[in-house]
From Swiss-Prot:
One of its GO terms (molecular function) is structural constituent of ribosome. Keywords: Ribonucleoprotein, Ribosomal protein, RNA-binding, rRNA-binding. Binds to 23S rRNA. Forms part of two intersubunit bridges in the 70S ribosome. It comes from the Bacteria. HAMAP family: Ribosomal_uL14. It holds the Pfam family Ribosomal_L14. The gene is rplN. The keyword Ribosomal protein applies. This is Large ribosomal subunit protein uL14. The lineage of its organism: Bacteria, Pseudomonadati, Aquificota, Aquificia, Aquificales. InterPro entries: Ribosomal_uL14, Ribosomal_uL14_bac-type, Ribosomal_uL14_sf. Gene3D superfamilies: Ribosomal protein L14. The keyword Magnesium does not apply.
Length: 121
């Protein structure tokens, strides 16, 4: 389960490696799942990347370690919790997506992110 103060991996090549979730915009919920937009701050970053340490970004959750029940009755879970950083227009900050992403991301309207991903599970 992902909640405020959780550390997440970054699944794109924006330059950030680890981020900390600091909020859930427009929601009073405690937990988030795949496809939700969250506010994060960068905790670890590469020196030459677009994302800098300490900056605040919006991000979409693409993988969660907690099992997720689908409408057909099947369950899916991943090895880590991962996000993709978004720019101010809601587009991916990076140009490549690393690792698989859940199908629910495409269903939530992030079709550009789903098309960049090598594998949609």
């Amino acid at each position: 389960m992902i909640q405020r103060q959780s550390y997440l991996n970054v699944a794109d090549n924006s330059g950030a490696k680890k981020v900390q979730m600091i909020g859930i915009p427009y929601a009073l919920r405690q937990y988030v799942s795949v496809g939700d937009v969250v506010t994060v701050t960068v905790k670890e970053a590469t020196p030459n990347g677009a994302a800098k340490k300490g900056k605040v970004y919006r991000a979409v959750v693409v993988r969660v370690a907690k099992e997720l029940k689908r409408s057909d009755g099947s369950y899916i879970k991943f090895d880590d919790n991962a996000v993709i950083l978004l720019n101010q227009y809601g587009e991916s900050l990076g140009t490549r997506i690393l690792g698989p992403i859940a199908r629910e991301v495409r269903n939530r309207g992030f079709t550009k992110i789903a098309s960049l991903a090598a594998e949609v599970v």
